[in-house]
């Protein structure tokens, strides 16, 4: 009763894919924390099993009940009579609780931000392996990173008097650095100042953007941005890194193209640069471009992926202030000032904002399993588009989303099939569609005045964190999204 709806069908992901060739049916069961498993074989045999799912009821900081997986110790005597049958805190759970309790017990003061960097170094044994299903991995190291990061965000949201999930919170930069270690677990929590920065010199690419098989470095991004020329503009991040922008003047309406608002979503950076190169090569380009909006988060992402290259690394998602730059509420605006300049210099009415999301299952097993406020993002569901429009722009938004999805389905080989595979598995475990599907691409269109420009097209590719052919495919889809939206906006008046 304290588990979220569909919690256990989602927890079973990706069982349906692992049992390829078998028909799998999942139905709600009793509330006694057992899976009832019925196996029917081709030869007519039937086997019934009950599998215990050890869970323990706890509460989030705001009092929300959380039914979370736990260790369990069951001891029977020589006659088979249970002597111990109870939850047993594992080392993994004890590490998590020690971190959260230490942070909760500290006197943080009354004003944001509360620190520059909150470094949480953890060394412990664990599990980390790939599954034979798409980009899926199973990792206790990743799970701990995610649960520590978001649990501490929730603590500081409550400490500051903000609602749970508030993205404007500026606690400072929270950095869970989780490492594999075969001995006893170790935890070191420290408050650190921001480090002095070395200048980043623009670097030329040794591989064409179209063939990039991993995220770009900051130097490579700077080199690509410098090559455009145009009217350059710049903001400065909280840690002092440049937020590089350029404006290419041309005929017709302008668009604003951006990537890496969330810095662990890296396919959009390459996609934005590739699209800008293609538009510039036509000779009539008219756009403002910020390929990497969040350079502090991007630097942290590159630091953390040295140890866990395939993890989603959500601690690098937000800025060094700890907020989502798109939700920044007041000056100094730092990175967001780049958007303000892009809007002013270009007069754009369409923002093409390239994003990503986890390429494999996202869990918080120490806090109720499903990621709070992000439950619909817990498993991949293909490439999809979110379109937000101001009041009065609904018809133009409809034409834009119809045109972009049709062109993507036509111009990107394998995209519709890729989406169909991921959506089929999503439906099997989420027991819902999640989004409308248009031309084989999930879409969500909403009226909102939160976006600065009248039209905001947000792309979402499951790219956290992929490499090789999948990364090339990801940034190709991102590029084609920009090209399709730009052409439709310029030529069809949407």
Q: Where are the regions that the model predicts?
A:
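C-terminal accessory segments enriched in acidic
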Residues: 1-212, 334, 344-346, 365-494
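Soluble metallo-hydrolase cores and metallopeptidase-like ectodomains found primarily
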Residues: 199-253
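Alpha-helical scaffolding within the catalytic cores
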Residues: 240-241, 303-308, 441-446
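Short glycine/proline-enriched loop/turn "hinge" motifs that connect secondary-structure elements
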Residues: 246-250, 317, 447-453
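Short acidic, Gly/Ser-rich segments with clustered Asp/Glu that frequently serve as metal-coordination loops
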Residues: 261-266
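Amphipathic alpha-helical scaffolding segments
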Residues: 272-276, 478
């Amino acid at each position: 009763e304290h588990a979220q709806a569909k919690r256990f069908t989602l927890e079973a992901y990706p069982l349906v894919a692992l049992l390829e060739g078998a028909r799998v049916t999942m139905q709600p069961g009793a509330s006694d924390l057992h899976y009832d498993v019925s196996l029917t074989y081709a030869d007519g045999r039937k086997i019934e099993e009950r599998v215990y799912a050890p869970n323990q009821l706890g509460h989030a900081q705001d009092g929300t009940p959380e039914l979370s997986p736990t260790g369990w110790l069951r001891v029977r005597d020589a006659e088979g009579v249970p002597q111990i049958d109870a939850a047993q805190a594992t080392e993994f759970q004890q590490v998590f609780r020690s971190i959260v309790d230490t942070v909760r017990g500290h006197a943080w003061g009354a004003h944001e931000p509360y620190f520059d960097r909150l470094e949480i170094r953890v060394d412990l044994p664990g599990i980390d392996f790939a599954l034979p299903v798409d980009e899926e991995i199973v990792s206790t190291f990743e799970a701990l990173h995610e649960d520590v990061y978001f649990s501490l965000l929730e603590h500081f949201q409550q400490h500051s008097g903000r609602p749970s999930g508030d993205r404007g919170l500026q606690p400072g930069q929270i950095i869970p650095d989780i490492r594999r270690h075969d001995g006893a677990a170790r935890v070191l929590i420290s408050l650190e100042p921001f480090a002095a920065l070395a200048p980043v010199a623009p670097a030329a690419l040794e591989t064409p953007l179209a063939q990039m098989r991993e995220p770009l470095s900051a130097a490579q991004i700077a080199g690509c941005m410098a090559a455009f020329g145009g009217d350059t503009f710049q903001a400065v991040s909280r840690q002092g890194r440049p937020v590089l922008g350029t404006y290419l003047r041309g005929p017709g309406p302008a668009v604003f193209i951006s990537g890496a608002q969330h810095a662990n979503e890296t396919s959009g950076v390459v996609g934005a640069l590739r699209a800008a190169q293609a538009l510039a090569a036509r000779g009539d380009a008219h756009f403002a471009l910020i390929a990497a909006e969040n350079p502090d988060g991007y630097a942290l992402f590159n630091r953390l992926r040295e140890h866990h290259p395939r993890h989603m690394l959500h601690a690098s998602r937000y800025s060094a202030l700890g907020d989502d730059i798109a939700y920044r509420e007041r000056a100094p605006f730092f990175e967001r000032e780049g958007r303000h300049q892009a809007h002013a210099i270009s007069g754009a009415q369409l923002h093409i904002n390239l994003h990503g999301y986890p390429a494999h299952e996202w869990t918080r097993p120490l806090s109720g399993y499903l990621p709070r406020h992000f439950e619909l993002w817990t498993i991949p569901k293909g490439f999809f588009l979110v379109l937000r429009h101001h009041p009065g722009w609904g018809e133009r938004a409809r034409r834009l989303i119809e045109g972009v999805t049709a062109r993507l389905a036509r111009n990107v080989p394998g995209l519709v099939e890729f989406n169909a595979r991921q959506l089929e598995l999503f439906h099997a475990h989420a027991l819902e569609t999640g989004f409308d599907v248009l031309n084989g691409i999930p879409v969500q269109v909403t009226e909102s005045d939160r976006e600065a420009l009248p039209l905001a097209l947000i792309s979402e590719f499951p790219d956290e964190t992929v490499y090789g052919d999948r990364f090339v495919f990801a940034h190709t889809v991102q590029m084609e999204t920009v090209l399709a939206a730009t052409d439709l906006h310029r030529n069809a008046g949407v």
